[in-house]
């Protein structure tokens, strides 16, 4: 009986006859030979159908079969050094499973809006396939890393009655007779978890009602948010760089084929596995921008062009330390020797990709935190549970948040966050 395999396992069956369930992505013919481009969800490779070596019925089917038709193919695996994948199948038999009508995403060029309108089908193509495989590896490596480091996974609520950074960018919903919001961060709940379990991380969707159309913004995206008790900011930075380097190394180790499909320079990625990452102060970053004739003054937040320029100046990710208090959230701990900045940092990815992590040591003093909440104009009653964490055995603790799609965009070397998530949600897109 012929063995049934996946395309990805072809390397283990060279010169063997196998059977594979596939979809047709493209084809061409030279008259006596048909070349079928095939996929099965694990990889892409080529099927070669030689007229003199198959029945007339099989060769005619190879000529007539339509793009995205599904079929069983039987044949012998051979090496193919010309392809990214490295193997092909010499087809001896084809059994049609499901015919396809006129498939809308043809091999020709299509505009991005057309492709996003057909995202449910575009996912089948090589580029999104490679990106989603790398996304999956980053998710797998995230769980592995934090498990190895002694963290517990904790699931914060998606519906919340309070907002960690104010309510200006929150999606409001009616919650029976009350107001509620879709979460924009699991951090406050992760802090509660850290006081119970020591080291926790959250990993889930968050929502930002930002009316932005830039390549770096989505309204729905995924965040990894670790929180660590008895840990100061410098120690947190070490965890952050170790985690990012771990993600990059695992993508290199497990997604070489997908990186080749994206033409991503693996040697470039290897540089990002070397730690520690460089660190500069916010003050120094402003000086660098001013020296490059950027219109910025101390106290301004960095925009995308600023972060792009700064990250371009380093061959590795770089930490920007100690931002002004006026441009960061209320829960951060002030610097011990400066009242105007926080013990915080953003990690900027190189190659112009900008911020992928934001983090800080958290304020532990009850009175100071209460005063900060009031100064923000937030309802203090909504935060009594959060203040309880300072009432009962407060300890130094730190945390950070990594935007999954931003990390994917950088590691894959792509231009826009919309390609880093299966079904992107943006200001002008909520379908399919």
From Swiss-Prot:
Keyword Cell inner membrane: no
One CC-aspect GO term: cytoplasm
Subcellular location: Cytoplasm
UniProt catalytic activity: tRNA(Asn) + L-asparagine + ATP = L-asparaginyl-tRNA(Asn) + AMP + diphosphate + H(+)
Any Pfam family: tRNA-synt_2
Primary site of residence: cytoplasm
Family label: Belongs to the class-II aminoacyl-tRNA synthetase family.
PANTHER family, alphabetized: ASPARAGINE--TRNA LIGASE, MITOCHONDRIAL-RELATED, ASPARTYL/LYSYL-TRNA SYNTHETASE
Subunit composition and interactions: Homodimer.
Stated name of the protein: Asparagine--tRNA ligase
Species in which this protein is naturally found: Latilactobacillus sakei subsp. sakei (strain 23K) (Lactobacillus sakei subsp. sakei)
